[in-house]
Every structure is written in C-alpha cells, then in structure tokens.
Amino acid sequence: MLIVLCSSCKESTEDEKAMQQMVERLFPEYASQFSFEQSEKIDKDWYEIEAQGGTVRIRGNNANSMAVGLNYYLNHYCLTSVSWYVNDTVEMPEVLPMPPAKIISTARCKNRFFLNYCTFGYTMPWWTWKDWERLIDWMALNGINMPLAITGQESVWYRVWTKLGLTDEEIRNYFTGPAHLPWHRMSNLDYWQGPLPKEWLDTQEALQKQIVARERQFNMRPILPAFAGHVPSELKRIYPEAKISRMSSWGGFEDKYRSHFLDPLDPLFATIQKEFLEEQTKLFGTDHIYGAI
C-alpha cells in the first residue's frame, strides 16, 4: 500500500521571511513566538494583530505593513521600543502578553518619506552595514516606504566623469571629504578636505547595494539622486563651449571651493543626466523616484 502524505503548510512568502528575519535580529529568543502572514493586497497598507495558540500572529498586505503591526504590539503590549542604534538592546518582558482582541489598522497615507541630505553627513559616513541594517529595521517598524538613498553616488559620478574625459585626480579632488559630502551633493561646496580615496568610493558603492536591496525587501522605494547641474570646473577643459557658471561663495569658504553649474538648456546637460541615470541603474536598480538638488 502506498500512502502519500500531503502537507497543508504553505511556503513562506518573501515578505513573511523578511519579517521573521527581522525578529531574529532584534530579539532572537522570542522569534518562535511570532508568526507573520501576508494576505490579499488592497488599495491601502494595513495590518492585523491577534493571539493564536500562544503566539502573536501579525498579518498584513506586505512586510512594511507587518513591521508597523509588530511595532504597535511592542509599544502597546510589551511597553518597549526599538531604537535605530545598533548597540541598543530591545527590552522585552519575560512572557509575551497576548492581545485580548484582534487589532486592525489601515495606513492614513500612501507615501511615507524619511531622511534628508544633511543626515548623511553626521555619523553616517562611517557607518557599517550593521548600522544601516538596524536603521532600515527601524524605518520598516515605523512605516517608512520612501527613504532617501544617496550613499555611494560618488562611485556613479566617478564612472560618469571618467567616461566624459576627466582624470582620476580631477574627479577625486572635486569631491569633498566624507563629512562634508552632503554639502557637496547639495551643490554648495567642492574640493574641501578632498580627495576621496578610491577605496572609500568602492566601499560606499558596495554598502549602497546592500542598503537598497534591504529597503526594497521591506517594500520601500529608495529615492535615488539625479543630475541637477552641478559639475566639476575641469569639465570646461573638455567642453570649452559648455555654459558653465561659477556659483557665489557659500558658508564663508574661500573662492577656490566654490561650485560650478551647467546651464540646463545646454545640450550637455541631457547627456550627463542620461549617463548618470544609466550608470546608477546598473549599480543600484531604480524605483523611478529621484531627488535632485
């Protein structure tokens, strides 16, 4: 007699796996007491929390929604919170409290933006993947789904400026040092405390690949940079007819640190934009949302 046993257990979705991995990172000793279930998608993000057989079951339309549900449970039933600092522990009760009734919530807004250019110039230039991993967990727990993602863009620019004829020395001198890159990226300042080491460019490129991959795992659409007109002054050597203007001094810095802008009506502008977006997409993919300043 041949007996075939069929399991009713379905394979976890990628969103469910992402959530299980999150709890294993944050409080591994409790991971088996949580279950996650991705359910049908509707027009709005939503989550549902309920007790089920001694475990906390969290349902939602995607990982981001389930993460928000987890955060609600932690805040209101465990009376704890998760910080974005990687070395902070999450203080959990000895016994997980079970919700007495089902909780259902729906997101009030579709797009939830986070971060700004300056944020990337405080301690972030020195962050490792572990620091970013914790911040992305925190972002998911708080429902962020449109994070600014500008790490590693200098590696893209290095490729673009090289393709347009600038030398390695010209390109790396054009960038500021790591702590001042936000103000370089905002077109305020060039050259200050440069050049950037090529090794640093490569490290940040690898880090950005990890960042955007994890953000997308939690249903986020990273906002990547685009070209706004800021160019190295040395570009004039290769394109002497280009309409490049020197900007006024900024923040009390000497004239030699002033930035330069290409006229958006100059045909070279579209060429640079196309090259940048193509190179960036090769490295980091795209969700077709960009920020330029």
Locations of regions flagged by a protein language model:
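Auxiliary, metal-adjacent structural segments of Zn-dependent hydrolase domains
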Residues: 23-42, 94
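Bacterial Sec-dependent signal peptides at the C-terminal "C-region" and cleavage site
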Residues: 5-14
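The feature marks proteins involved in alpha-glucan
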Residues: 80-99
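Aromatic-residue-lined binding/catalytic grooves and analogous aromatic/hydrophobic interfacial grooves
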Residues: 76-77
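Aromatic-lined carbohydrate-binding surfaces of glycoside hydrolases
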Residues: 38-43, 48, 52-64, 68, ...
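Short Lys/Arg-enriched alpha/beta "domain-start" segment
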Residues: 15-23
